[in-house]
Amino acid sequence: MVADAVAKVCGSEAIKANLRRSWGVLSADIEATGLMLMSNLFTLRPDTKTYFTRLGDVQKGKANSKLRGHAITLTYALNNFVDSLDDPSRLKCVVEKFAVNHINRKISGDAFGAIVEPMKETLKARMGNYYSDDVAGAWAALVGVVQAAL
């Protein structure tokens, strides 16, 4: 199942190009991107806050050092994923390692999928006129790799 999701992403030049192009914009400020993504998650899917109680008051945003740390760690994981697009076995490995942390917190593939819409909104905000549905679809496909690992 993970292998199929990896093959879909790594086997598509269009998906890889959209991920790389958009990551070029998102990674210009890793911390701000991560915090925006988390804020969008909590705004669009307030039910997901229950997975993050260990972080304290997530409404404090950047002032919450635990949330800030999570946001930075998350975006470095995304960076790892994008860096691994030309090596399917490497992408599979880094995604499976990432998945372990979520499995330990009892986050299912379906629950993890809640990040797709917040990611779309983050992409729109950060990319402006460069945003497209194809870019959002590429990120949804990458999220699908994580979901398959969960």
From Swiss-Prot:
Keyword Metal-binding: yes
Protein keywords: Heme, Iron, Metal-binding, Oxygen transport, Transport
Domain of life: Eukaryota
Residue intervals of the Globin domain: 10-150
CDD domains xref list: Mb-like
Subunit structure: Heterotetramer of two alpha chains and two beta chains.
Official protein name in the record: Globin-2 A chain
Organism: Anadara inaequivalvis
